[in-house]
């Protein structure tokens, strides 16, 4: 069976003398594994479109164990990402996230579109990286079915409290009367709550110029990191560690 679909290259591994094994996040088939035969030959028609991050259009043959790339045309190479180590590291973090949370063969059109928009934003030189990455994280959790409750207490639905905490296990805010519902819940400021709501509700293209303080970014980053860990069991994102040192 042949299918034609757009997709992003998440991973490219050498196989044999001239072949490549690809992990592709596609619009029509979700995350797939595919072999690109002869793709590493210098004159291969597939070579340009199978580089990491590439957004390409593929003609794929579905075999018993994996797909075979019959044709591939690069639509966007994302050269600016490759020329800036910090942007490259954050883009690699997004790839790690998507690969960690997606299931082979399961489509997620909203996540596919979000991933594409975010990569296109990261290649621009005049954007604020931190709010874009935080927006991607919180929207990703929403699209996986873990939308955090940020408008009221997840336990009693109260909208008022002396101080909020965020419970990764309960999936949202806890008011001061409900702290006992999760003894490991993390303190979260009212400003961070408002920022999280903004990032969750707005299209990611609307946050590209948003400026947030390092303190606020760090607060929300820690909370989202715990939230992602709780629901994906993925903690060690090497690319994020590299990006944050730059």
UniProtKB/Swiss-Prot annotation:
The keyword Iron does not apply. InterPro entries: ARFGAP/RecO, DNA_rep/recomb_RecO_N, NA-bd_OB-fold, RecO, RecO_C. Transmembrane segments: none annotated. It comes from the Bacteria. Pfam families: RecO_C, RecO_N. GO terms for cellular component: bacterial nucleoid. Keywords: DNA damage, DNA recombination, DNA repair. One of its GO terms (biological process) is DNA recombination. Belongs to the RecO family. Involved in DNA repair and RecF pathway recombination. This is DNA repair protein RecO. It comes from Alkaliphilus oremlandii (strain OhILAs) (Clostridium oremlandii (strain OhILAs)). The lineage of its organism: Bacteria, Bacillati, Bacillota, Clostridia, Peptostreptococcales. The gene is recO.
